[in-house]
Swiss-Prot record:
Lineage of producing organism: Bacteria, Bacillati, Bacillota, Bacilli, Bacillales
Name assigned to this protein: Pantothenate kinase
HAMAP family in the cross-refs: Pantothen_kinase_1
Alphabetically ordered keywords of this record: ATP-binding, Coenzyme A biosynthesis, Cytoplasm, Kinase, Nucleotide-binding, Transferase
Chief place where the protein resides: cytoplasm
Length: 320
Protein backbone atom coordinates (compact mmCIF):
# COMPACT_ATOMS: atom_id res chain seq x y z
CA UNK A 1 0.00 0.00 0.00
CA UNK A 2 1.43 3.34 -1.06
CA UNK A 3 2.15 5.71 1.81
CA UNK A 4 0.08 8.87 1.60
CA UNK A 5 2.19 11.97 1.04
CA UNK A 6 1.66 14.79 3.53
CA UNK A 7 1.43 18.20 1.91
CA UNK A 8 1.55 21.05 4.45
CA UNK A 9 -1.23 23.61 4.18
CA UNK A 10 -0.03 27.00 3.00
CA UNK A 11 -0.56 29.81 5.50
CA UNK A 12 -3.17 32.43 4.62
CA UNK A 13 -0.89 35.02 6.26
CA UNK A 14 2.31 36.80 5.30
CA UNK A 15 4.54 37.04 8.39
CA UNK A 16 6.83 40.00 9.09
CA UNK A 17 9.43 40.36 11.82
CA UNK A 18 9.86 43.77 13.47
CA UNK A 19 12.52 44.98 11.04
CA UNK A 20 10.55 43.93 7.97
CA UNK A 21 7.33 45.47 9.26
CA UNK A 22 9.02 48.69 10.38
CA UNK A 23 10.38 49.21 6.86
CA UNK A 24 6.78 49.45 5.61
CA UNK A 25 6.37 52.72 7.48
CA UNK A 26 7.96 54.39 4.43
CA UNK A 27 7.80 58.16 4.96
CA UNK A 28 4.81 58.14 7.32
CA UNK A 29 5.42 60.99 9.80
CA UNK A 30 5.32 60.49 13.56
CA UNK A 31 2.31 62.56 14.62
CA UNK A 32 2.12 61.73 18.31
CA UNK A 33 4.01 63.36 21.19
CA UNK A 34 5.57 61.82 24.30
CA UNK A 35 2.91 63.44 26.47
CA UNK A 36 0.10 62.07 24.31
CA UNK A 37 1.62 58.60 24.38
CA UNK A 38 1.84 58.60 28.18
CA UNK A 39 -1.90 59.28 28.34
CA UNK A 40 -2.75 56.54 25.85
CA UNK A 41 -0.84 53.61 27.32
CA UNK A 42 -2.28 51.09 29.76
CA UNK A 43 -1.74 51.04 33.52
CA UNK A 44 1.14 48.55 33.42
CA UNK A 45 2.01 48.79 29.74
CA UNK A 46 4.96 51.08 29.03
CA UNK A 47 4.63 51.92 25.37
CA UNK A 48 7.71 53.46 23.75
CA UNK A 49 8.01 55.80 20.79
CA UNK A 50 10.09 53.08 19.14
CA UNK A 51 7.11 50.73 19.36
CA UNK A 52 4.83 53.37 17.87
CA UNK A 53 7.29 54.05 15.04
CA UNK A 54 8.11 50.42 14.28
CA UNK A 55 4.67 48.84 14.66
CA UNK A 56 1.81 51.33 14.75
CA UNK A 57 2.92 53.82 12.10
CA UNK A 58 3.18 51.11 9.41
CA UNK A 59 -0.19 49.79 10.58
CA UNK A 60 -1.76 53.25 10.36
CA UNK A 61 -0.35 53.58 6.83
CA UNK A 62 -1.87 50.23 5.84
CA UNK A 63 -5.24 51.16 7.34
CA UNK A 64 -5.14 54.55 5.61
CA UNK A 65 -4.71 52.75 2.28
CA UNK A 66 -7.62 50.42 3.10
CA UNK A 67 -9.83 53.36 4.08
CA UNK A 68 -8.96 55.21 0.87
CA UNK A 69 -9.70 52.16 -1.25
CA UNK A 70 -13.02 51.58 0.51
CA UNK A 71 -14.02 55.23 0.08
CA UNK A 72 -13.34 54.95 -3.66
CA UNK A 73 -15.42 51.77 -3.82
CA UNK A 74 -18.35 53.48 -2.08
CA UNK A 75 -18.07 56.43 -4.46
CA UNK A 76 -18.05 54.11 -7.47
CA UNK A 77 -21.18 52.39 -6.17
CA UNK A 78 -22.92 55.74 -5.60
CA UNK A 79 -21.98 56.84 -9.13
CA UNK A 80 -23.38 53.62 -10.57
CA UNK A 81 -26.63 53.95 -8.63
CA UNK A 82 -26.91 57.65 -9.36
CA UNK A 83 -27.38 58.68 -5.75
CA UNK A 84 -25.47 60.70 -3.19
CA UNK A 85 -26.10 58.84 0.06
CA UNK A 86 -24.21 59.97 3.14
CA UNK A 87 -20.81 58.53 3.94
CA UNK A 88 -20.48 55.12 5.55
CA UNK A 89 -17.91 54.76 8.34
CA UNK A 90 -14.97 52.39 7.89
CA UNK A 91 -15.17 50.02 10.88
CA UNK A 92 -12.10 48.41 12.44
CA UNK A 93 -12.53 45.55 14.93
CA UNK A 94 -9.81 44.86 17.52
CA UNK A 95 -9.99 41.59 19.47
CA UNK A 96 -7.86 39.84 22.07
CA UNK A 97 -7.75 38.64 25.64
CA UNK A 98 -8.30 40.59 28.82
CA UNK A 99 -5.01 42.34 29.77
CA UNK A 100 -3.32 41.74 26.39
CA UNK A 101 -3.22 45.45 25.55
CA UNK A 102 -5.95 45.75 22.93
CA UNK A 103 -7.32 48.93 24.53
CA UNK A 104 -3.92 50.62 24.24
CA UNK A 105 -3.67 49.44 20.64
CA UNK A 106 -7.11 50.91 19.92
CA UNK A 107 -6.31 54.28 21.51
CA UNK A 108 -2.99 54.63 19.69
CA UNK A 109 -4.57 53.75 16.35
CA UNK A 110 -7.41 56.19 16.99
CA UNK A 111 -4.90 58.98 17.57
CA UNK A 112 -2.67 58.13 14.61
CA UNK A 113 -5.53 57.61 12.16
CA UNK A 114 -7.16 60.90 13.13
CA UNK A 115 -4.01 62.73 11.99
CA UNK A 116 -4.41 61.57 8.38
CA UNK A 117 -6.08 64.34 6.32
CA UNK A 118 -8.71 62.19 4.57
CA UNK A 119 -10.32 60.74 7.73
CA UNK A 120 -9.92 63.16 10.64
CA UNK A 121 -12.88 61.95 12.68
CA UNK A 122 -12.13 58.62 14.38
CA UNK A 123 -14.38 57.27 17.15
CA UNK A 124 -13.69 54.41 19.55
CA UNK A 125 -16.32 52.17 21.14
CA UNK A 126 -15.71 49.18 23.41
CA UNK A 127 -17.95 46.13 23.46
CA UNK A 128 -18.11 46.32 27.27
CA UNK A 129 -21.10 48.60 26.83
CA UNK A 130 -23.01 45.72 25.26
CA UNK A 131 -22.67 43.45 28.27
CA UNK A 132 -25.94 42.74 30.01
CA UNK A 133 -26.38 44.73 33.25
CA UNK A 134 -25.32 42.90 36.41
CA UNK A 135 -28.95 42.45 37.45
CA UNK A 136 -29.65 40.46 34.27
CA UNK A 137 -26.48 38.40 34.68
CA UNK A 138 -27.38 37.64 38.30
CA UNK A 139 -30.95 36.67 37.39
CA UNK A 140 -29.59 34.28 34.76
CA UNK A 141 -26.94 32.86 37.10
CA UNK A 142 -24.04 33.85 34.84
CA UNK A 143 -22.43 36.69 36.80
CA UNK A 144 -19.18 34.72 36.96
CA UNK A 145 -19.27 34.34 33.17
CA UNK A 146 -19.10 38.04 32.42
CA UNK A 147 -17.14 38.40 29.19
CA UNK A 148 -18.24 34.99 27.88
CA UNK A 149 -20.42 35.07 24.73
CA UNK A 150 -23.70 34.58 26.60
CA UNK A 151 -23.07 37.67 28.78
CA UNK A 152 -23.44 40.07 25.83
CA UNK A 153 -26.63 41.60 24.49
CA UNK A 154 -25.78 40.49 20.97
CA UNK A 155 -29.01 41.82 19.48
CA UNK A 156 -28.26 45.33 20.74
CA UNK A 157 -24.65 45.09 19.52
CA UNK A 158 -25.68 43.96 16.04
CA UNK A 159 -28.34 46.67 15.82
CA UNK A 160 -25.73 49.27 16.80
CA UNK A 161 -23.28 48.13 14.12
CA UNK A 162 -26.05 47.90 11.53
CA UNK A 163 -27.20 51.45 12.27
CA UNK A 164 -23.63 52.78 12.05
CA UNK A 165 -23.03 50.99 8.75
CA UNK A 166 -26.36 52.28 7.44
CA UNK A 167 -25.03 55.82 7.80
CA UNK A 168 -27.51 57.03 10.42
CA UNK A 169 -26.59 60.54 11.64
CA UNK A 170 -26.56 59.48 15.31
CA UNK A 171 -26.20 56.08 16.92
CA UNK A 172 -25.99 55.55 20.68
CA UNK A 173 -23.96 52.91 22.51
CA UNK A 174 -24.41 52.03 26.20
CA UNK A 175 -21.61 53.02 28.59
CA UNK A 176 -19.85 50.54 30.89
CA UNK A 177 -18.01 51.55 34.06
CA UNK A 178 -15.05 49.44 35.15
CA UNK A 179 -15.19 51.23 38.49
CA UNK A 180 -18.67 49.98 39.38
CA UNK A 181 -18.31 46.90 37.13
CA UNK A 182 -21.69 47.52 35.49
CA UNK A 183 -23.58 49.33 32.74
CA UNK A 184 -24.20 52.98 33.67
CA UNK A 185 -27.97 53.65 33.58
CA UNK A 186 -29.13 56.43 31.24
CA UNK A 187 -25.61 57.19 30.00
CA UNK A 188 -24.71 56.86 26.33
CA UNK A 189 -21.85 57.34 23.92
CA UNK A 190 -23.13 58.96 20.74
CA UNK A 191 -21.49 58.10 17.42
CA UNK A 192 -22.11 60.74 14.76
CA UNK A 193 -21.00 59.50 11.34
CA UNK A 194 -17.25 59.25 11.95
CA UNK A 195 -14.86 58.60 9.09
CA UNK A 196 -13.58 55.58 11.03
CA UNK A 197 -15.08 53.68 13.94
CA UNK A 198 -12.82 51.42 16.02
CA UNK A 199 -14.66 48.71 17.95
CA UNK A 200 -12.54 47.02 20.62
CA UNK A 201 -13.47 44.02 22.73
CA UNK A 202 -13.23 40.34 23.54
CA UNK A 203 -16.00 39.26 21.22
CA UNK A 204 -15.60 41.18 17.96
CA UNK A 205 -14.46 38.11 15.99
CA UNK A 206 -16.68 35.48 17.58
CA UNK A 207 -19.09 33.50 15.37
CA UNK A 208 -22.84 33.76 15.95
CA UNK A 209 -24.46 31.72 18.65
CA UNK A 210 -27.78 30.10 17.92
CA UNK A 211 -30.83 31.84 19.32
CA UNK A 212 -34.11 30.12 18.67
CA UNK A 213 -35.97 33.31 19.61
CA UNK A 214 -34.22 35.52 17.07
CA UNK A 215 -33.29 34.12 13.67
CA UNK A 216 -31.35 37.27 12.87
CA UNK A 217 -28.91 36.58 15.72
CA UNK A 218 -28.09 33.13 14.36
CA UNK A 219 -27.68 34.39 10.79
CA UNK A 220 -25.66 37.59 11.23
CA UNK A 221 -21.99 37.54 12.23
CA UNK A 222 -20.71 40.58 14.11
CA UNK A 223 -17.56 40.65 11.98
CA UNK A 224 -19.74 41.06 8.86
CA UNK A 225 -19.85 44.76 9.72
CA UNK A 226 -16.07 45.20 9.97
CA UNK A 227 -13.91 46.44 7.10
CA UNK A 228 -10.69 45.39 8.83
CA UNK A 229 -10.01 43.20 11.87
CA UNK A 230 -7.01 42.96 14.20
CA UNK A 231 -6.20 40.33 16.83
CA UNK A 232 -3.72 41.19 19.59
CA UNK A 233 -2.01 37.95 20.63
CA UNK A 234 0.42 36.84 23.34
CA UNK A 235 1.13 33.55 25.08
CA UNK A 236 -1.26 32.95 27.97
CA UNK A 237 1.56 32.80 30.53
CA UNK A 238 2.54 36.36 29.58
CA UNK A 239 -1.04 37.63 29.67
CA UNK A 240 -1.53 36.09 33.11
CA UNK A 241 1.62 37.86 34.33
CA UNK A 242 0.33 41.20 32.99
CA UNK A 243 -3.10 40.57 34.50
CA UNK A 244 -1.63 39.92 37.96
CA UNK A 245 0.64 42.97 37.69
CA UNK A 246 -2.31 45.17 36.74
CA UNK A 247 -4.43 43.74 39.55
CA UNK A 248 -1.73 44.68 42.08
CA UNK A 249 -1.46 48.22 40.71
CA UNK A 250 -5.22 48.69 40.87
CA UNK A 251 -5.09 48.29 44.67
CA UNK A 252 -3.58 51.78 44.87
CA UNK A 253 -5.81 53.28 42.18
CA UNK A 254 -9.32 52.16 41.20
CA UNK A 255 -9.77 49.59 43.99
CA UNK A 256 -9.12 52.26 46.64
CA UNK A 257 -12.14 54.28 45.47
CA UNK A 258 -15.06 53.79 47.92
CA UNK A 259 -17.46 53.37 44.99
CA UNK A 260 -15.37 50.62 43.38
CA UNK A 261 -17.00 47.22 42.95
CA UNK A 262 -13.62 45.71 43.88
CA UNK A 263 -12.85 47.90 46.92
CA UNK A 264 -12.59 44.74 49.06
CA UNK A 265 -9.32 43.97 47.27
CA UNK A 266 -7.63 47.31 48.07
CA UNK A 267 -6.06 46.08 51.32
CA UNK A 268 -4.73 42.76 50.03
CA UNK A 269 -1.04 42.01 50.45
CA UNK A 270 1.09 41.23 47.39
CA UNK A 271 0.82 37.51 48.09
CA UNK A 272 -2.93 37.67 48.61
CA UNK A 273 -3.43 39.81 45.50
CA UNK A 274 -1.43 37.35 43.40
CA UNK A 275 -3.51 34.45 44.70
CA UNK A 276 -6.84 36.22 44.10
CA UNK A 277 -5.89 37.47 40.63
CA UNK A 278 -4.60 34.06 39.58
CA UNK A 279 -7.83 32.47 40.80
CA UNK A 280 -9.96 34.92 38.83
CA UNK A 281 -7.84 34.29 35.77
CA UNK A 282 -8.08 30.52 36.07
CA UNK A 283 -11.84 30.49 36.65
CA UNK A 284 -12.93 33.22 34.25
CA UNK A 285 -10.49 35.03 31.97
CA UNK A 286 -8.16 32.17 31.13
CA UNK A 287 -11.05 29.81 30.43
CA UNK A 288 -12.74 32.41 28.23
CA UNK A 289 -9.50 33.00 26.34
CA UNK A 290 -9.00 29.33 25.54
CA UNK A 291 -12.64 28.50 24.80
CA UNK A 292 -13.90 31.58 22.99
CA UNK A 293 -11.29 34.23 22.21
CA UNK A 294 -8.13 32.48 20.99
CA UNK A 295 -10.05 30.31 18.47
CA UNK A 296 -11.16 33.52 16.70
CA UNK A 297 -7.58 34.60 15.96
CA UNK A 298 -7.70 32.89 12.55
CA UNK A 299 -10.59 35.15 11.55
CA UNK A 300 -8.50 38.33 11.86
CA UNK A 301 -6.99 40.09 8.87
CA UNK A 302 -3.96 41.12 10.90
CA UNK A 303 -2.36 39.59 14.00
CA UNK A 304 -0.03 41.47 16.34
CA UNK A 305 2.08 38.89 18.20
CA UNK A 306 3.47 40.31 21.46
CA UNK A 307 6.37 39.06 23.56
CA UNK A 308 6.85 39.05 27.34
CA UNK A 309 7.85 42.74 27.41
CA UNK A 310 4.61 43.86 25.68
CA UNK A 311 6.55 44.60 22.49
CA UNK A 312 5.23 43.21 19.21
CA UNK A 313 7.58 40.50 17.93
CA UNK A 314 5.91 39.79 14.61
CA UNK A 315 2.98 40.85 12.46
CA UNK A 316 0.85 38.53 10.35
CA UNK A 317 -1.18 40.03 7.50
CA UNK A 318 -3.78 37.96 5.70
CA UNK A 319 -3.16 37.58 1.98
CA UNK A 320 -5.77 39.15 -0.27
Amino acid sequence: MMERMYIPMASPYVTFNREQWSALRASTPLTISDNELSLLQGLNEKMSMTEVSDIYLPLSRLLNLYVGGTQELYQATHTFLGNQDGKVPFIIGIAGSVAVGKSTTARILQTLLSRWPNHPKVDLVTTDGFLYPNKVLEDRGIMKRKGFPESYDLRRFINFLSDVKSGLPEVKAPVYSHLVYDIVPDEWQTVRQPDILIVEGLNVLQPPRGDENDARISEVIVSDFFDFTIYVHAEEKHILQWYVERFKLLRQTAFSDPSSYFKRYASLSDEEATEVATGIWTEINGANLRQNILPTRVRAQLILDKGQNHMVQSVKLRKL
